Amino acid sequence: MGYQHEKQNKDLWVSDEHGDTWLNTGDMARKDEEGYFWLTGRKKELIVRGGHNIEPKIIEEAMCKHEDISLAAAVGRPDLHAGEVPVCYVQSLNNKLDREDLLAFATAHIPEKAAIPKDIYILPELPVTVVGKVFKPELEKREINKKITKEIEAVLSNSQFTVEVVQNPMHGLLAEIQLHNCTSKAAETVDHRLGDYTLKYTVSQ
């Protein structure tokens, strides 16, 4: 059993702690109190920027018109004022791409002003599922991690901390922030700094 093409079967089957085998399709689901699993579909990809609902395909299709881009993925970056702003990750066919040139290209080719990415990241490869689809949660985790790290460093410049973004069954992507050798006051400072963001997080010491 599996996919027709053998290369798509790599890491397709996974086993849990009970020895049961599962098919890793990339879909999301929740388990109820009776042990039943409910498929909830794939993660909602719509980027909500203030009052604008942005369809990532608008960005991705425009960026893939560039002759040196083989793949593009648009995700939301947490933003204090707009909730989210769009950013775009692109897979390069060579090493000639320039960020500023791509931002200008995006401005010229994306018809919706609110959908123009605030930043563009050039990667040799984008994370993909076993069937070749871009695995956007990995990119969203990166954006959440970068935003939280930047905010904590702004208020606790000399403190040590770690940020891990995980998939939570209740909250979706959840940032778990661990402060090292910090006081409760420091934890309150971090919580106050992040409190106005729409992202989900926990702070522990």
Predicted regions and their residues:
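Conserved short beta-strand edge segments in small beta-sheet-based binding/regulatory domains
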Residues: E112-I122, N158-Q160, G195-Q205
